[in-house]
Amino acid sequence: MILKSFILGNLVSLCMKIINSVVVVGLYYGFLTTFSMGPSYLFLLRARVIEEGEEGTEKKVSATTGFITGQLMMFISIYYAPLHLALGRPHTITVLALPYLLFHFFWNNHKHFFDYGSTTRNSMRNLSIQCVFLNNLIFQLFNHFILPSSMLVRLVNIYMFRCNNKMLFVTSSFVGWLIGHILFMKWVGLILVWIQQNNSLRSNKYIRSNKYLVSELRNSMARIFSILLFITCVYSLGRIPSPIFTKKLKETSETEEREEETDVEIETTPETKGTKQEQEGSTEEDPSSSLFSEEKENPDKIDETEEIRVNGKEKTKDEFHFHFKETCYKNRPVYETFYLDGNQENSKLEIFLDKKDKDLVWFEKPRVTILFDYKRWNRPFRYIKNDQFKNAVRKEMSQYFFSTCRSDGKERISFTYPPSLSTFLEMIQRKMSLFTTEKLSSDELYNHWNYNNEQKKKNLSNEFINRVEVLDKGFRVLNILEKKTRLCNDETKKEYLPKIYDPFLSGLYRGKVNFFFSPSIINEISIKNYIEMLWINKIYLILLISNYQEFEPKMEDRIRILKFLFDAIIVDSKNKKIVKKSTEIKKEISKQIPRWSYKLIDDLEQQEGENEENAAEDHEIRSRKAKRVVIFTDNQENPDSNTYNNSKTKDTTNFDQTGEVALIRYSQQSDFRRDIIKGSMRTQRRKIAILKLFQANLHSPLFLDRIDKFLFFAFDTSELMKIMFINWMCKNAEFTISDSTSTYTEEKTKESDKKEKEEIKNRREEDKREEKVRIEIAETWDSIIFAQAIRGCVLVIQSILRKYILLPSLIIAKNIIRMLLFQIPEWSEDLKDWNREMHVKCTYNGVQLSETEFPKNWLTDGIQIKILFPFRLQPWHRSKFKFLSKDPIKKKRQKNDFCFLTVWGMEAELPFGSPRKELSLFEPIFKKLKKKIRKLKKNGFLTLTILKEKRKLFLHLPKETKNWFIKGILFLKEIINKFSKSKRNPILLFGFREVYELNETKNEKNSPINNRTIHKFSTSIRSMDWINYSLTEKKMKDLNARTKTIRNQIEKITKEKKKRFLISERNISPNKLSYNAKRLKLKSSKNILQILKRNNAQLVRKSYFFIKILIEKIYIDILLAIINIPRINVQFFLESPRKMINKYIYMYNKKENHKRIEKTNQNTLIHFISIIKKALNYSNFNKNSKIFYNITSLSQAYVFYKLSQVQVINLYKLRSVFQYHGASLFLKNEIKDYFGVQGRFQFKLKDTNFRNSVMNEWKNWVRSTYQYKYDLSQIRWSSLISQKWRNRMNQQHMIQNKDLNKWNLYDKDQLIHYEKQNNFEVDSLSNQKDNFKKYYRYNILLYKSINYEDKKDSSIYELPFQLNNKQELFYNYKIDKRKLFDMSGGIPVNKHLTEDDIIDTEKSSHRKYLDWRILHFGLRKKVDIESWIDTGTKQKKNLFDWMGMNEEILDRPTSNLEFWFFPKFVILCNAYKIKSWVIPIKLLFLNFNGTKNVSENKKINKKKNNDPFISISSNETKSIQLKNQNHEEKESEDQVDLESVLVNQEKDVEEDYVRSDRKERRKKKQYKSNTEAELDFLLKRYLCFQLRWDDSLNQKIINNIKIYCLLLRLTNPREIIISSIQRGELSLDILMIQKDLTLTELMKKGILIIESTRLSVKNDGKFIMYQTINILLVHKRKQQINQRYRKKNYIDKKNFNESIVINQSLTRNKDKNNYDLPVPENLLSSKHRRELRILISFNSKNGNDINTEIINNNNIKNHAHIIDKRKHFDRDKNKLIKLKLFLWPNYRLEDLACINRYWFDTNNASRFSMIRIHICPRLKSR
């Protein structure tokens, strides 16, 4: 067996080696290369298909030889560099390709261009074989690949980087390609043979009969192949942008001249006393107006032209002035323009610059770059705009670029090498003659690198050890800390250069400033040298001048330059203004450097800024095609401007300064641009597929499965399945008579509701289909060239024809016909209707303008013509007094009293809709005729039937009866005549009775015997004279049969009624006496009915006339009563208990809510026990109902609830369970801990010394409170924290910790914790939340390296306090793995108190929390906190209590908004409290309700307010603090009132956030109203919510706008207003909106709604890295601000307090544990700290060693003897603290980001784990 396995293992390893060998991989890749087809295959196939005979064989051989030779050259070029350069450069391949393609095209078509003959046989026959060889060779070198792509060819190039034996790999890959090529050609040959031998093809009649066509095809085959070749070449060229016509970078110089100067501020020390000098010619400018205007090398100024002002007097085209680059320094402009004085050496300068400009011309525009730009300026094709971090467009290119660089002292290939640096290096190598071409060996480089690193490490280590030794001697820390070096003018005066100009400072203080020195301080000899070195780009200097050393400044000149730094800037101590000197130079010295703009704009932004000053010339981003349609032009001044948005129709309105109101109309076509940048390659975008004629959104074929209806299956399978299932259920369902009339009626109502819903659904689907067709028609018109102009002209012609020709002619014809028919003509009525018809010109989307005014650019953009009150030609006019139609369909038809004109002159409901059916002139005539004919037919039928019956009667009656009957009739006639003589109305004893059906009664739906019993009652005819007896006999028989069925039905109903009342007696409470009374009443009515029905037959037989009618009436009335009474009673019976139950539940809930409100602040509440009480109380509500408990979650809780009711129990049997301090497998930790704290069992507390027993009373109190599951909100928890109280507890804890038993439940291993979690035994929050949070944020490896021994007691990452998390019994438990900065969704508002969610308000008083008094909401009543905390369930919570609103509620009117808004806003506010550094504090001082009245005692210290995202990493306090919180600080000169902040709100918004990029074009925008300012403030700030209005309101407003645009143009709009209000188009409630409403009032009225935005956060590597670093940077900021609030430590004050470092980070536990020690490395500056750690990690000899001198020195002596004082301190913890203090100082994560790119050539944070190899070596314990 061993032998077999050994042999098998060897075979497997052998096979693996063979598969992974270079030869096999090369063969495989070469074989794959075969599948990439190109145009060269066309020549090869043509030689095989066309050529025949001896010459054809030669051509086949030559074609194959050329093809293989070309491919071999391509493979060799991979390895051989010169050949690769020749074939790989675009210049050479284009020089080869273009002439050869032209030659080849004319070679095949030069002679017989219009003939059908073979051209290759007759001309230059001797060269034909050579030409075939060249064709195949050269086209193989062109490297054009069509199918499937060129990726397969490049696989060989890619694998070359991994392969060691490159030549063998190239050879094997070529052999593999050759094998694939041979197989392919064999396959082609087989196909050709099969085609020749196939009889079906040869026997085709069409082919045989057209032999001439076949021969013609063979002769023209050469031309066909040339056409195919041309198409493939065009296809290949189409995939790359044209090098000449692509959009290049702007190179035009736009000079910007300013008349103003800004005073430059300078920072001085308190001892500084500057000299006073006059300032000449400077005017003060508002500081806020230039904020962020030219940040970061003036990013949006594409040119960097510098200007010089001449004499300070006049400005001409040739006179310019210089200005510094402006940077953000504490929210103030640091510079503005800066003039030079002097009048010397201007002529020399002019001569020198003229000479230099001539030399620069040829280099600036080389000939090659005209065709090819290998720097790829047009490379990026996507622009991601980020308001917080605006990067260059160039940033979006790929980060992978291969080049060699030195890393760790060795030459290595870097795949993230900057391409610009590589290009620059190549330029230097070509141009510089002194460039060293000698290369050192790798060993020499490595040794030199190691030596330098060792020297640096020794120097830094010695400096660090010296500082620690001095500190150990007892010196002050401030004297030992390493200071930053600053540039100083004089030691005595201590006048420093401002930080923005100081070259020795780093970070945000550094600004990029271009200094230009005055010729007055430089002698005449060196003037040219300085101009060369400082004004001309140094890159060009290096490239042009080889002897560059002669231009280096000498030492004396350097001294003069430094002297100039202080002479040029002179300080006035009072005004803090910089006085500037100026010189004059008459010539422009500028260099236009092509650079990418930092902000690109699209069409819409360009149109918005057209009327602003300094607007952008052209847009850079190609966005969706849009047309701007002006709908209204206001000639008057517009005091206030509003903005309307229509999301459905994609219309946005735009207000210009001219008063134009415009709609932006977007087409429904696919957006092929997709925000592409001009000049970029579209082919590099993701491929898209077009599936429909008009597809609004393009998408990749990858997402075909996510489309609603798949491409090949047009029907919806889910709908078909539903229909089939319903039909199947209906077939199998048995028809049963329902036991209850109410259930029957409910089913009927459900069915009717279902039918109505289906009808509504079908109607909506039909509307959607019609809308889709309409949009397609509109887009078709819009897409065809000149279609809009043709359509517009046709519409105008149709409008004129209709109004002035067609309708008047119809009116004339109608009235002439009326006169011919002797009717009164209706000229006035028709003319009135004709005058009422209005033809309103509309925009393409249907916005009404006026009758006379045409839309702007209507011939190109389109036009619609809307007909208001369309004329209807009527044969006659009705009287005005008529009833309104109650039919909703007719009402709807009346409402839509307008239409749109179509091209064919017809009417449509909507633009491009289907034409509606027009009412004909003869339709009412035909209707009237039909009615009359129907009436005549009815009357005639009745008379005929009566006559027939009379005739039958007289035939069958005997003579005596006839005589008696005739006498009676004569007698009646006499009586009638008497009555008629007396001129009275005749008494109609009998008359016609109308036919009716029972189904037409009102109770049709409620009748249980509907469609099953009586369908029709017979027709009874009441005659005026006599009735036929035979007819009555027939009716009698029918009536008898019907009587029997009625009797049976009544009996059946009574039985059902009895049965139903028997059931109801059991359920109805006995005090409901009305039911018994009704039942007796029903019984009595039933008996009467039965008596009547028994005698019914006899009564009918005796009296055939009156009693028959009477019985029918009685029968109908009683039957309907019997049917209705049970229905009403049963319905009442069913509804009353339901109401009673609902009322009971409501009262119960109200009572419970009241209890909950009273118990809000009782911290001793046990949550799960209270829930059990509620469940038990609820179970008593109905004894018959059964309650099923979840045994896994409720069994222990219920048992221990019963146990808790006993005062003291001697739980002897459970003693071992309670005394066991490990992880219990069957007893929940929280229950055990609860019983231990409450003392429910009697046994002695054992004083055990556990490893984690060091715990203060604060944490025990929180644990004991929180484990009772009283779930407060995070905000309420933060209010409970008191730092002083906790410190006092700490102080007491040092004495009391001996006898404290903490119930060691909190130090659990993660794996056990995971098993316990699955068994519903959840461990503490301090472990669980810690683990998930840190695993997600810092990466698993980083977390383990920090806290790999003890996850609980980390001295660095312990946060303010830790709490115990328990598994809830009734709520869903969620582990919060949230994203870091996803503010709207990622921050949890749940029932868990996480560590990082707590903010210590006393410690962090610099933060201004979002006060609820700022945002005014109408709250209806107080509600418990628990009603709005998210418990994980999907309960709708309408009200909430937030930050003490129960105690103080604003007296404001209630808002009519829905309360769905509030929970979302709660998330936002909690997010603000948790991460308040994201939102600028200035934001909170804007008064939202429009008033600016603020109490005077509140003033703001406007101190260095910076952009919040920049200020994260700042080293100084940048916040605004209230005056009453800053009593210990002096009042500075910068203090301003809050009113001034609000007055300057517009400028702050625009300059502080928007950072006007395009030459300050947005800077001068002025707001016209408070509303506009507030809207801008809200929408452009960092708050994560947006304003919107309701959808229904949205459509209403758009409709109103359309009506307003029409009304404003009409002279007498009264009639249109009234009709619009009647039709519902004009809403009066929207008209009541005032234009001066503030944002708060708009929200109160429900017009505007605030809702949180749905942010889509892409957590890529850079984002995670930034967030990881950001955590420590925030703590660093907190540490600097909270220095004055720092409390004293309570340990060894003599030795330890002296060594507390000021810059100590606050990331450690704020409880001041005894192991919370300072980091000794903080003695060094951050730069040297980083350098020391990196150099220690670069220990080349032993990678796992670290410098033991630093560890074993005396720098840890102070910490060691403090720790030894503790009695029960763990020994291992001492070593662990030393290790952590040494390995992980506070700046460690900052180092990770800095080192990451340079060590591992990556900026992707997913590779963080690799860094631990160097940074975190494991220490062996000694």
Curated annotation (Swiss-Prot):
Role according to the record: Involved in protein precursor import into chloroplasts. May be part of an intermediate translocation complex acting as a protein-conducting channel at the inner envelope.
Compartments, record wording: Plastid, Chloroplast inner membrane
Biased composition (Acidic residues): 256-268
Name of the molecule in the record: Protein TIC 214
Annotated family: Belongs to the TIC214 family.
Miscellaneous remark of the record: There is a partial copy of the N-terminus (positions 1-601) of ycf1 in the inverted repeat (ABO36758).
Keyword hit for Lipoprotein: no
Any single Pfam family the record assigns to this protein: Ycf1
GO cellular component assignments: chloroplast inner membrane
Chief localisation class: plastid
Superkingdom in the source lineage: Eukaryota
Gene Ontology terms describing biological process: protein transport
Annotated coiled-coil segments of the chain: 1031-1102
Organism: Populus trichocarpa (Western balsam poplar)
Region ranges (Disordered): 250-310, 742-765
Bias (Basic and acidic residues): 293-310, 745-765
